[in-house]
């Protein structure tokens, strides 16, 4: 299962306020819902691609939230600096194995 998510809640039209960290937490909140629907947990996640509008400014905060979310055994991850849609700071593509 692959999901590409942003910091825009499903019921919203703009990113959650609070910067890249808040957007990353919103992405993980949405992903938890998808994992629950698939009847798997975070250990099923095998890779993550992060797309950041401001890598230098935001990578430390995003890294901290990533570690909090995945704990001591995080999946493979790549981070890229990109030009995201207006107003967005983070986008993530998460891949999980469904057994």
Q: Model-predicted segments: where are they?
A:
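Short, polar/acidic, helix-capping and beta-turn segments at strand->helix junctions
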Residues: 1-99
């Amino acid at each position: 299962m692959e999901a590409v998510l942003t910091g825009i809640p499903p019921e919203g039209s703009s990113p959650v306020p609070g910067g890249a960290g808040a957007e990353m937490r919103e992405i993980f909140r949405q992903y938890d819902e998808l994992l629950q629907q698939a009847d798997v947990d975070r250990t099923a996640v095998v890779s993550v691609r992060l797309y950041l509008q401001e890598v230098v400014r935001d990578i430390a905060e995003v890294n901290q939230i990533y570690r909090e979310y995945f704990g001591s055994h995080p999946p493979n991850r790549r981070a890229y600096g990109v030009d995201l849609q207006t107003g967005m700071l983070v986008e993530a593509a998460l891949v999980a194995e469904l057994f």
